[in-house]
UniProtKB/Swiss-Prot annotation:
Pfam family for this entry, one: MurB_C
Protein's recorded name: UDP-N-acetylenolpyruvoylglucosamine reductase
PROSITE patterns with a match to the protein in the record: FAD_PCMH
Superkingdom: Bacteria
PANTHER family documented for this protein: UDP-N-ACETYLENOLPYRUVOYLGLUCOSAMINE REDUCTASE
Any single Gene Ontology cellular-component annotation: cytosol
């Protein structure tokens, strides 16, 4: 029996798609074909996938909702898992629990509806709750580390564990999950009671700032670089004269130099080449070496 036949038998009922390009699902609108693109509906299906991948020695990767990543044009080997369907969110007192595939922006709106404060900083961050925990997503002085109470993960051995915020050893755009091989299943956030109008005003203010400063009208991978100590990446790129700098179909945004936008059917290679070129030119101009925030995954074509 071939691996594919075995997969269809053992993983019957799970939504598995073969040779389906990731550019249809990524925020950058680039990305080649994974071997198997999977949309699990619940933790049980995710655990079945993990057991099968371990038994058959098939690589697997969870992409959340593919927002702060670039998938290379040659695609990704093994299972690629999109968790959009694991999206339940519940509220218990001042605590919100959200599954990994829940939309982060929508989760902040649920907090607003329940007059819970603390999540406002994330009201414009695209992506999933799982990805936000993985990256310790943040903006405007707030970050996931400030509000996370605990999270459930599926370990690389297929076990479910509950981790505290301390266990995750959060740092700037970093959590211990990045090295552990575990996958976020859900997260609990400890918020505080607030006033609906005040929370809404703050979310409206931050949303307006994003719309003013960020090129939301174009496909992009979000913020490309981490913030260098004592500097702002966008400012360094701008000072190096790189606004509008373009390779292939991807260019440095004129609106915010910390973003690279897909303006003309760009490819992952265009993104990668532009990122490397910007790092080199900023280093030449200011002496500062930029570090990527966006993850680049998969194989070149």
């Amino acid at each position: 029996m071939s691996v594919r036949e075995k997969m269809l038998e053992i993983l019957e009922g799970i939504d598995i798609r073969f040779k389906e390009p990731l550019h249809s699902y990524s925020y950058t609108k680039v990305g080649g074909e994974p071997d198997y693109l999977v949309f699990p509906r619940n933790r049980c299906e995710l655990a079945r996938l993990k057991r099968f991948s371990n038994q058959e020695h098939i690589p697997w990767m969870v992409l959340g909702n593919a927002s702060n990543i670039i998938v290379r044009d040659g695609g990704i080997r093994g299972f690629v898992i999109l968790c959009d369907k694991l999206n339940n969110v519940s509220v218990d007192g001042y605590t919100i629990e959200a599954e990994a595939g829940a939309n982060l922006i929508e989760t902040t709106r649920i907090a607003l509806r329940h007059s819970l404060t603390g999540f406002e900083f994330a009201c414009g961050i695209p992506g999933s709750v799982g990805g936000a925990v993985f990256m310790n997503a943040g903006a405007y002085g707030g970050e996931i580390a400030h509000i996370l109470q605990s999270c459930k993960v599926l370990t690389k051995d297929g076990e479910i564990e509950t981790l505290s915020a301390k266990d995750l050893a959060f740092g700037y755009r970093h959590s211990a999950i990045q090295e552990s091989g575990s996958v976020v299943l859900s997260a609990k956030f400890a918020l505080a009671p607030g006033t609906h109008q005040v929370i809404k005003q703050e979310m409206d203010r931050l949303t307006h700032l994003r719309e003013l400063k960020q090129p939301l009208e174009y496909p992009s991978c979000g913020s490309v670089f981490k913030r260098p100590v004592g500097h702002f990446a966008g400012q360094l790129i701008s000072e190096a004269g790189l606004k509008g700098y373009r390779i292939g179909g991807v260019e440095v945004s004129e609106k915010h130099a910390g973003f690279m936008i897909n303006v003309a059917d760009g490819t992952a290679k265009d993104y990668e080449d532009l990122i490397e070129s910007v790092i080199e030119k900023v280093k030449e101009h200011s002496g500062v070496t930029l570090e990527r925030e966006v993850r680049i995954l998969g194989e070149s074509k």
